[in-house]
Curated annotation (Swiss-Prot):
Bias (Basic residues) ranges: 559-608
Species of provenance: Drosophila willistoni (Fruit fly)
Protein name: Lateral signaling target protein 2 homolog
Binding site for Zn(2+) 2: C927, C930, C957, C960
Domain of life of the organism encoding this protein: Eukaryota
Keyword Magnesium tagged: no
Alphabetic keyword roster: Metal-binding, Phosphoprotein, Zinc, Zinc-finger
Compositionally biased spans, kind Polar residues: 372-405, 535-549, 978-993
Lineage, opening ranks: Eukaryota, Metazoa, Ecdysozoa, Arthropoda, Hexapoda
Amino acid sequence: MCDDGAVCAATAAANADDKSLLARFYHADRSLTAVASELDSFDGRAEPDRCSRLVSRLRQNQDKVLAITNLIMEELLGEDRDPRAFRAKFPEEVLQENLAGQLWFGAECLAAGSSILNRETESKEMRPLAQAVTKSLGNVRVLLRDQCLRNNVPNSKTLHLDFNDCTTEQLYESLKIFDRLFAEFELSYVSAMVQVKSRHEYEMQQWIGVLFSETLQRALKMGLLDQEMVDAFDPGLMFSIPRLAIVAGLVVYNKGPLNMDMPGDQLSEMFRPFRTILIKIRDLLRNLNQQELYQLEKLLCTNEDINTKAPLGSSSIEAPSQQDYSTANTHRTLERLTVDQRNNNNNINNNSSSSSNSNSGAPSVQEDANHRSPSMLSLSTASPTPSHSIGSTFSAATSSTNPPVNWSDGDDADDDDDGDDDDEDDDDDVDDDLVGNDDSDDDDDDTTDEHLLDDIVAADCASGYLIPNTNLGNLLQPQQVTLTDNFVASDDDDGYGQVAAGAGNDEEPSTSAATRHMQRLHLPSSDSYGDADGSHNNTTTIKSPDSDGQQQHQQHTSSRQRHSHHHHRHHHHHHRHSSHSSHSHHHQHQQHHSQPHPHRTTRSGRKRCSLESPTDVDVTVVQPEPEPELVSASADNSTASSLSDDISLAMRNTTARLKFKSTENLLHRLFVCIAGVADQLQTNFASDLRQILRSVFLMNVSSSQEEIDDIPEKTKESELFEFRASENDVIQESAGSNQSIYSAEEVNPELDNVFSASGARHSAGASMQRNHTTIDNNNSTSSSPPDATITTTTTTTTTRSHVTRSRSLGDQEVVASAAAAAAAAVNEEREMQRQRNNSVGSNTPSSASSSATSSSSEQNSPVSMRSGTGRRRHQSNNETQMPTTATTTTTTGTGTLAPPAWIPDGKAPRCMSCQTPFTAFRRRHHCRNCGGVFCGVCSNASAPLPKYGLTKAVRVCRDCYAREIRSSGGGGGGVVQMQRQQAANRPQTASAS
């Protein structure tokens, strides 16, 4: 046994070029053992440089040993291998070819007692598993070395093991154990090193891919993107699709993966860090109408200028009418609210106390009062109508000469008088941004307020309340104002002058802290306010006297004309009204409304307005513990009470956009925020985003493009990818051109006149086919003399160059006389393909015709027997079709062949030599000599290919390498035979020549 083993070992050592799996494992394992022994023979701390070099070599040898072991397990275990579907959850950067070596190195370190940095707990848990992995791998190495000495067959592509031998059975079981342990350790180790997706996260990523795909299809239907961009994989779509997906996921498919109402831990990790800003973006997007949303999406796609120049409010969602009470762009809670437009019209036209009484308790009107439609944002912003002016909540104090609202006790009223005037200059710009004030019309306030009031009241009756939300973050706030949720601003008092002292007598005072709070905010005097602090249980009643009715009527007549021109300036105008005028305006407002206008419900209480009589109006604020008589005054508003929470949320959405001075400003801010989030995905989640976008492109590519990719034999689009100069290879054509070729289209000056005659030089065959352009190879050959730098050219070389060139440009010309020969060639090629898959070489005799410069190595080249999808070459036995002007059969050493076409990766699921399936770790490699697809082991050789113009060493497969090395420059029949065999797959082109 020992003698036989020694003989086998000596034989294996002598045959170092043996390419069988067992022999390769034997030599790789010996090299690894030698490096490990050297590494253990000295103190690494004394010689750190040497230790570092040896560790690098050790890891390389570990990679090699594990790669060969993996091939052996693929062949022996087959379907019994442990599944590794968990790799789909790994980040893309983890899936590398040397991952197995890293895992082995990590297992040895853990087994030796080391720990992963900052992962002490995980290291302790994985240490027993790491010890089991290293022990199992050592056992497998011993058994495989024994099999190398027992059952190795030199240069065998398969394992020849004796399955009746107990050692073979032991090897089989050991491989199964090692495979299971190594897979378990791989998952544990990678999970400890990087973040691995959970099942829920993986499903959420798939849903995000669906969202991206739906977004792309929606953009195509809307005309935002073109199908040509998708088919061409336009890089700009890498940025446009995520941006559009954020918009669509927030407002269009709002129940999908970007549903911000779900808990944060259920969101995808891609969008979880941006949850807060996405909620704010959603709130603003819901207030955009269709035109504004389209402009925003167009801006996100093209970065073009915004065309919307209208004011913010005029371009928002339309007001509810008698037929249509809501629009699709408003919040879903708005859709549940209705507006009694007929009552509103009666209120505007009649101005009667009976109308006011008849509608004072209508629930539908109560709902409308609590929830203003965003269509009238500009009017409500510019309106001094009681309970409706909202801009004051976001701006500081505007210019005002009157004292603020009497929120506190009588002795605090005088203190409030001085607060607004001091800061009016500092805050005018803020107010101008929101409502567009103009100081030029201050002198006309006393004469034009009636008409302004009339139009504003009509608008307010039709659109309800707008209560500001004050919780938005600084990112979406163009104006930095310190606002809280502890107060709700309304316009009942201040819009038409301050409340008179007499009215304050009937008012139960609120706390002085609330008054000081409002003073600090410098809210404009055009607004009236409810309770400043919802935590206090108090009731404020503001009564309007009878004597103010006449003045209201006069002002109502005169304000109509002014409002049409200056409705955006009402805040500034009405800050200078007297307190008596304030009562009159308030009374007139109640006549026009003739229904209650409840305020926004705060955290601690609910505010309502009720009408008691045509002349005496009580604006009642109901807190959690109100007095009984005040509760009875608003008992008929139960419908609005049940919807108060939804209304409060909707009000935040509809009024958030009032912080922006124009629609353009709002859209620009949304663009910045959305683009910022989407671009962050490109950086923080690049791997996941690439996978999602790749799937989206594959799902949405046009059908014609899919056919081109799937059937390259018919369309010859794959010819564009038959050669890639990724190794700095330069192809020199017969004319001496030194251009680098990055596609299938070669540089051939002999056909320049052909392309100039046909119009333009195309890079793809499809474009030539669409233009119905054909190239006559016979004519081009006879009329195009060779370049001056070429001394002689054979008929075969010229014809091959012309036909190959025509083929790469989509020449589909068919000659009927060659149909029979083509059919025979197809059968011959199929037989050759079967032989190629089952054998290494070919003994097919060469053709009688030959070329002097073609090496004899091509006679047995696997090019002639590889798959016909990407390695076919033109048939060269067509001298009878060539003109008599080219009769020589010799060629110079400067003539080169066209590079072989590459087989597409999708057409080669297995290595064409060892038949090993490709995985994420076993990558595909193309042989530059035959175009076949091989694994890294079967294509690890390199050799120059001067016949293709490749003077530097390039990657070739083992078979081609052996033939190139063994070739001695004999007869050239191999080229002709290769061309005949490859022409069988392309009978049309062959016959056309």
